[in-house]
Swiss-Prot record:
Organism: Oryza sativa subsp. japonica (Rice)
Disulphide linkage map: C46-C49
Protein name as catalogued: Glutaredoxin-C3
Record domain Glutaredoxin: where: 26-134
Family: Belongs to the glutaredoxin family. CC-type subfamily.
């Protein structure tokens, strides 16, 4: 009988751990966007990105900034952001994707939407609602 017990143990193999899933670019954007009150997807050499970051800092808001050119998966994220923002045309015809801003985990949009919200007065309430601005 010992032989039978040893044989059973020899053939027992625990189930292998499932292979980790690679997070899709859109899922990663959504996850990163939900981790902070204000999230800016940017390119470090982009003047429009710099302007939107300065706008927030000037208001006393310190956004979490994800520099796509410094991220190994930055190109994938940029394509995902283009889909989310609605830029679907050919690369030569489409406007620059960055900066893309999320406030309270919700997509605000690119620079044009952020500046429009700032000018019409709707940006401050969004920031307060997200907990990024207290005054």
């Amino acid at each position: 009988m010992q032989y039978g017990a040893a044989a059973e143990q020899a053939w027992y193999m625990p189930a292998a751990a499932p292979a980790p899933m690679v997070e899709s670019a859109v899922a990663r954007v959504e996850r990163l966007a939900s981790e902070s009150a204000v999230v800016v997807f940017s390119v470090s050499s982009c003047c429009m990105c710099h302007a939107v970051k300065r706008l927030f800092c000037g208001m006393g808001v310190h956004p979490t900034v994800h520099e796509l050119d410094l991220d190994p998966r930055g190109r994938e994220l940029e394509r995902a952001l283009a889909r989310l923002v609605g830029y679907g045309g050919p690369a030569a015809a489409s406007p620059p994707v960055v900066p893309v801003v999320f406030i309270g985990g919700k997509l605000v949009g690119a620079m044009d939407r952020v500046m429009a919200a700032h000018i019409n007065g709707s940006l401050v309430p969004l920031l307060k609602e997200a907990g990024a601005l207290w005054l």
